[in-house]
Amino acid sequence: MIDKLIIIGASGHGKVVADIARKMNKWQSIAFLDDDESIKISMGLEVIGKTADAFTYKDEADFFVAIGNNAIREKVQEMLIEEGLNVVSLVHPSAVIGTDVEVGIGTAVMAGVVINISTRIGKGCIINTSSSLDHDNVLEDYVHVSPGASLAGTVRVRKGSWLGIGSVVSNNVNICSGCKVGAGAVVVKDITEPGTYVGVPVRKID
């Protein structure tokens, strides 16, 4: 049985992830890898090397990629998966997870999150603090739902999109890949073109 977790990324997001891992009480030891050589300890946990050193620990640890940038997180996680490393999901004990919910590998579900029945969440997603996903949502791989965001029922968010803090998505709305939705924005109809969207209701600004 593997009792060690290695978290790639020791900055802010990594610290939150480490706190979740501790509260899950699944691993006896937790350590970080980070390419910033100036970081030696984070959350009282040792930084034991750089990202490339993950392969040294392939057979003795589970892995989690705690990088906030969606594209970089995808690149690193897919590299680990391709090389056969065991990437896990992390779910805070305070999260409320409904029946028939799927959470993909490498996804973090933070404190206070509510995920309702029959929702599907892909690989490498961030479901951030106190966000809510209602019934029958589909979040594709490497999506980030920021703190306090609210998704109504039957919402679909395509790969790699990011919903800003406090954003709201109405029911039955589809958001295409490559979108950034700004803080406090309200999405009331489908977004079909990649870009940055802000406002109430949202408008495209680039």
Cite the ranges covered by each PLM segment.
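Short amphipathic alpha-helical segments
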Residues: A18-I20, K75-M79, I121-G122, T192-E193
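Short phosphate-engaging motifs
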Residues: H13, I72, V187
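Glycine-rich adenosine-cofactor-binding loop
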Residues: D3-A21
